Amino acid sequence: MSDNAKTSATDIVQRIISLLTIILLAYFLFKEGLFSVDQRLLSLATIVLLASFLFIIFLVLFKWPLGNLNKKEIRRTIAIVTTSFYFGTLSMVLSGKLELTEEVGALIDGLKWAFMVVVAFYFGSRAVEDALKSKKSAEECPQNTDAEAG
């Protein structure tokens, strides 16, 4: 399979996941008024979030042609989906459209931890990659101090 086909396949996967996230958020925002949602819809959104995440992991682990996502694409997709779902759920509770039951509280607590892990992973792995690149470039281009001294 050519590189263009792999790139277009990864673009398709990213667009599908982004589209599902946008559709869910739009449904939350505009169904019967701002942030009107019931418990069944929240359960459906949780299932879609988990299915999207597991689909990405499945593609990468089994090295399907669609599974040639690079680190940046995986990191970006997971960060977008988790952040959108976390802030969507949090805003529904804060607006009062979603009743804060024990189950919803546990979901928000779990999403809070997932959000913190994703943010730490996203920025931490970028920092490590940048540090490794700068170290590698410094090793490849050593400065010749002997030539300057002579």
Swiss-Prot record:
Keywords: Cell membrane, Membrane, Transmembrane, Transmembrane helix
Coiled coil: none
Membrane-spanning intervals of the chain: 12-30, 40-62, 74-96, 106-128
Subcellular location: Cell membrane
Membrane topology, from the record: Multi-pass membrane protein
Domain of life of the source: Archaea
GO cellular component, one term: plasma membrane
Name recorded for this polypeptide: Uncharacterized protein AF_0523
Main location as per UniProt: membrane
